[in-house]
Amino acid sequence: MTDPLASGFALFETPIGVCGIAWSPRGILGLQLPEATAGATRARLRRRWAGATESEPPAGVQRAIDRVLELLAGGAVDLGDIPLDLETAPEFHRKVYEVARTIPPGQTMTYGEIARKLGVPHESREVGQALGRNPVAIIVPCHRVLGADGKMGGFSANGGVATKRRILEIEGASAVGAGPLFERLK
């Protein structure tokens, strides 16, 4: 039997595809958004957390998975209290992630707004770089961060901006100053 406190990872089915989650005794190490196949998602997790073994998630990790699933099913779920293990992330990145975790589902913030909240108003590009390296997408909701004037900006997950747009649509987000983000042509 696998020790539930050992670093591990698991795959789980979501409305956007097969995601993966990796954990340590301190918290969630990473949340992998879907790759093209479940096998590719598994391979990405194995490369990124080589010491982790695929196993059944412990109770706390399963609760995190359940909450992510609820969010991706359209629930207004706050994931801000899920314990994370970001020990290896640079300090500036951790600060950016803390601010991003305060953005409620269905709302957005710009890279510049996060930079201003951190007291570094001219470092919106650095905020974007930190979010581009976010190992715990969804839990640290980098998809809720937009460029100036509500522009989508980039998204490093498989599917790029289309994936970001889909997650925001599930959450019911609106573009900053532009009305519904996903208004359909009639």
Regions found by a protein language model. Name each.
Residues 1-122, 170-186:
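Basic nucleic-acid-binding alpha-helical/helix-turn surface characteristic of O6-alkylguanine DNA
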Residues 88, 131, 156-159:
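Structured beta->alpha junctions
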Residues 121-131:
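Short, positively charged loop/turn segments that connect secondary-structure elements
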Residues 133, 139:
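Major-groove DNA-recognition helix of helix-turn-helix-type DNA-binding domains
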Residues 144-146:
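Short, basic, alpha-helical segments at the C-terminal edge of helix-turn-helix-like DNA-binding modules
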Residues 148-186:
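…primarily DNA-binding HTH/wHTH and HhH modules…
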